[in-house]
Swiss-Prot record:
Tissue specificity: Highly expressed in lung, heart, and skeletal muscle. Expressed in brain, eye, liver, kidney, smooth muscle, pancreas, thyroid, thymus, submaxillary gland, spleen, testis, ovary, prostate, epididymis, and uterus. Deregulated expression promotes apoptosis in response to growth factor deprivation. Overexpression in synergy with CCNB1 may promote genomic instability.
Organism: Mus musculus
Localization of this protein: Nucleus membrane
Protein name as annotated: Myc target protein 1
One biological process term in Gene Ontology: hematopoietic stem cell homeostasis
Amino acid sequence: MANNTTSLGSPWPENFWEDLIMSFTVSVAIGLAIGGFLWALFVFLSRRRRASAPISQWSPTRRPRSSYNHGLNRTGFYRHSGYERRSNLSLASLTFQRQASMELVNSFPRKSSFRASTFHPFLQCPPLPVETESQLMTLSASTTPSTLSTAHSPSRPDFRWSSNSLRMGLSTPPPPAYESIIKAFPDS
């Protein structure tokens, strides 16, 4: 009969596991190196893109000293503007202003008013008159004479209608007085 022998040896080469561990370690190291390079490249490009958009144009190298008051018409972020003194914001707040595109600067006429091109969320403005300045607005019967006398107080500035629209910065009329709401819905 034929001699039937089985080989008890491993089907793998002698240093297979050592080579496998070495190749795995080298591939992980190469992957980490490539990943780190790509991460650094993306961080560099994102910081460069962010730095190319000007946040503030208050740098002394870009404008002469004589145009200090003209700086209020520029776009960007400004801290402690003159209009914030009338607002309810804290001292450390920022005034956010729309950023105009550099291509559109010369194509459209610019507004000369800093207040017209800036968002003021808590600016305290007097209410608008309902009709023209020569006519009184019609008030409900619940309005008291003290409310009528405060509607045209001498301390309030005179706001006029312009040719096309109202002057910039005026707010909508306030809600009705709290006393009239409380009288309309008494507690039971």
